[in-house]
Amino acid sequence: MAKFIIYPAIDMRDGKCVRLVQGDYNQETVYGDSPFTMAKSFAEQGAEWIHMVDLDGAKAKERMNHEHVVKVATELDVNVQVGGGIRTAEDIAYYLDRGISRVILGSVAVNNPAFTKEMLQKYGGEKIAIGLDARDGYVATEGWLETSSVKAETLGQELARHGAEVFIFTDISRDGMLSGPNTEAIVQLAKATGKQVIASGGVSSLQDLDALRNEKQNGIAGAIVGKALYTNQFTLEDALKEES
């Protein structure tokens, strides 16, 4: 079984590293001026993957902070997965052609499943991750500004049938709250789809990571960690030490 992977997160807005609370653009804290410097620090601490989100792109519905993502992928010895503002075949090709390991489709997976299936067929389920950001079980889109009538599990099952291998599940109510992840909902999605699910939102302690890691046999393949690292709840080194 593949090992449980920790993904330190870098959320970018105006070229800076920021964190939002529950995706609220008005509740922003800036943690650094350079995504590259932040990524370098994560890589030096042993990260194998870095999760990068283009918040400007998510809102504007087009790529905005892409040059920072490409710099990290090409100049550091890490795998990068990126989400935010990826809407077109050209966006996907732009990133994958420049050494980014995995592209996350979020809003477009809800709004245009046919396109998403086409991209899964073209690039395969390891390169195209499906980002399911849920509010009370329903998928939210457009930088979380809108909630759809689509259930996360239903969409997950449909896309799994068409080649999706990796899902990233975010419980919006937990994001940036340091309140602990919604392990139950993540396991439920993994069981419904039979695929790997990466947990995102709410990780606040090494105990939270242990709880997720203990569900590895149930399909939880990793965890994205953001605010907990930036507010020094624990170090990335400590989190990676237990990675297995």
UniProtKB/Swiss-Prot annotation:
Species the sequence originates in: Halalkalibacterium halodurans (strain ATCC BAA-125 / DSM 18197 / FERM 7344 / JCM 9153 / C-125) (Bacillus halodurans)
Q: In which pathway does it act?
A: Amino-acid biosynthesis; L-histidine biosynthesis; L-histidine from 5-phospho-alpha-D-ribose 1-diphosphate: step 4/9
Gene Ontology molecular function, alphabetical: 1-(5-phosphoribosyl)-5-[(5-phosphoribosylamino)methylideneamino]imidazole-4-carboxamide isomerase activity
**Xref: SUPFAM superfamilies:** Ribulose-phoshate binding barrel (SSF51366)
- Where would you say this protein principally sits, based on its record? cytoplasm
Keywords, in A-Z order: Amino-acid biosynthesis, Cytoplasm, Histidine biosynthesis, Isomerase
> Source organism's superkingdom?
Bacteria
Query: What family does the Swiss-Prot or TrEMBL record give for this protein?
Result: Belongs to the HisA/HisF family.
Q: Does the keyword Amino-acid biosynthesis apply?
A: yes
Tell me the GO BP annotations in alphabetical order: L-histidine biosynthetic process; L-tryptophan biosynthetic process
Give the EC number(s) under which this enzyme is classified.
5.3.1.16
Q: Which reaction does it catalyse?
A: 1-(5-phospho-beta-D-ribosyl)-5-[(5-phospho-beta-D-ribosylamino)methylideneamino]imidazole-4-carboxamide = 5-[(5-phospho-1-deoxy-D-ribulos-1-ylimino)methylamino]-1-(5-phospho-beta-D-ribosyl)imidazole-4-carboxamide
The protein here is known as 1-(5-phosphoribosyl)-5-[(5-phosphoribosylamino)methylideneamino] imidazole-4-carboxamide isomerase
**Does the record bear Isomerase in its keywords?**
yes
Q: Where in the cell is it found?
A: Cytoplasm
Q: Which InterPro entries match?
A: Aldolase_TIM, His_biosynth, HisA_bact_arch, Isoase_HisA-like, Isoase_HisA-like_bact, RibuloseP-bd_barrel
